[in-house]
From Swiss-Prot:
It is found in: Cell membrane. It is a multi-pass membrane protein. Its main location: membrane. GO terms for cellular component: plasma membrane. It comes from Halalkalibacterium halodurans (strain ATCC BAA-125 / DSM 18197 / FERM 7344 / JCM 9153 / C-125). This is Uncharacterized protein BH0177.
Amino acid sequence: MKKRRSNLELLLQCFYRKKVYLSVFIVLALYCVNLLIENASSEKNVYDLLMQLTEFHPLTYTIIPTYLVVLTAHFSLGKMHHYLAFRCKDKRQWYNLNVSCIAIVTTGYSVLIAFIMLMQSLFVFRFENKWSTFAVDYYTYHATFLMNYSPLVYSIATLLLLWLLLFLLGLLFYVIFIWTKSPLVSLLFVFLLNIMNAAVTLGKIDTLTPVFFTDRVSIIQYVYKFDLNQDSFPYSIFVYWIMLIAVIYLIGWLVIQRVDFESEKGEKHHAS
């Protein structure tokens, strides 16, 4: 007898859109090649490249837009979401199922970018766990920080920050989707948020920078912007993102209370 698949397995299968993922992979691979060419230098190592994960240009112009493509493709499934809602016993299970799936996809997406960078760097950069000559000379303001923390620790923290940012945007995308029932509206909202962040950053509008994320996703930028003690690791940057995620999660929970879940399940059951 064939084992019945769990709701999470079904939802993850829905997330797997072969053509979309292949297109996203190609775009990411090409962009990472471009970063590799730009950063190729005997004075740099692989950690200089990994630091780019949370830099303004890669995030704004490639990483966030391609991530939004993946989310939009998934939430455009239509009837499959109705079927999955019918399989869930209540709103809480339905909501947490989607949140869990977004977390898993965000993890896979973040690891994929790091994996592409590492594979492309094998024959170009050194992998020793020490700061490059370029980093030491360029980040003179952060000399104390560089002495206290290794590039491996910094790279792991950078990957975690990338995950937190993308998961927050994914959660926001989902909350708007619950409210509007339109993946295109969700895409437009989050994409405009990204554009506004870019405008504030490029325009150097200091009064609005605290509202947006550029200064709080790169540890180097965060330490410089807020003139932090470089002898202590800036754990507050992670607390900031965790608190934001908690707020958006709670807002989503309030929004989903307005959904007539039992009625929708009945309609979906009838439609099937």
